[in-house]
């Protein structure tokens, strides 16, 4: 029996790195803020389990003057499309979302995935992480955990713990802005 293997050994190396971040508080907002500041302005998707949580996280980050946008099923379609467009074109580097963004969106070069809430099942974990490390790219997935939270069996226990600096500097504003010009009611400019 002959076996053909066209993949070079280095191609088999994992392209997705898993890390955990321990939050000293059950409310993980400050830990998320520090992690986002530490990561800088790299394309980052933050997953929450509920629409209300998405809105709460976005409100907190915007109050801290951290630019971000949200994406969930309770939003009007034009608002969702606008948020995705800004995320894709780089004028918004951080998108806070429910699992609605975990499937079917082809967003190239997402560098980081942050699980603000633990995914509800293995399928959600797989699809969330599938937004990064696509094709030949690498990516990093972070799980923010409170000390009392236990990892579900489908998430590997062996992962590096990332220690965050006390007060990381907020990254500078994006160099890009998105300008929307509507066509009006009669679709004329």
Language-model segments: what does each one mean?
Residues 63, 167-189:
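Non-catalytic terminal extensions of ATP-dependent helicases
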Residues 94, 121, 129-167:
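Conserved segment of the helicase C-terminal RecA-like domain
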Residues 12-63:
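Conserved interdomain hinge at the start of the Helicase C-terminal
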Residues 103-118, 140-144:
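A short beta-strand element within the Helicase C-terminal
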Residues 9-11, 25-28, 51-54, 75-77, ...:
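Conserved nucleotide-binding/hydrolysis micro-motifs of P-loop NTPases
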Residues 54-60, 65-102:
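Conserved helicase ATPase core of P-loop NTP-dependent helicases/translocases
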Residues 1-7:
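A short helix-turn-beta junction within AAA+ P-loop NTPase domains corresponding to the substrate/partner-engaging
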């Amino acid at each position: 029996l002959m076996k053909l293997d066209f993949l070079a050994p280095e191609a088999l190396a994992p392209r997705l790195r898993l890390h955990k971040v321990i939050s000293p508080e059950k409310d993980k907002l400050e830990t998320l803020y520090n992690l986002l500041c530490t990561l800088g302005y790299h394309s980052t998707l933050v997953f929450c389990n509920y629409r209300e949580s998405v809105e709460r996280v976005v409100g907190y980050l915007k109050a801290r003057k951290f630019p971000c946008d949200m994406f969930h099923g309770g939003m009007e379609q034009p608002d969702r499309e606008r948020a995705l467009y800004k995320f894709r074109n780089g004028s918004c580097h951080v998108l806070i979302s429910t699992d609605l963004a975990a499937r079917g969106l082809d967003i190239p070069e997402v560098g980081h995935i942050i699980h603000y809430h633990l995914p509800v099942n293995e399928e959600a974990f797989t699809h969330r992480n599938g937004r990064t490390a696509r094709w030949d790219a690498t990516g990093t997935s972070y799980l923010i955990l409170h000390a009392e939270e236990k990892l579900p069996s489908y998430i590997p226990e062996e992962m590096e713990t990332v220690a965050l600096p006390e007060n990381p500097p907020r990254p500078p504003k994006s160099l890009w802005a998105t300008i929307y010009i509507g066509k009006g009611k009669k679709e004329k400019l």
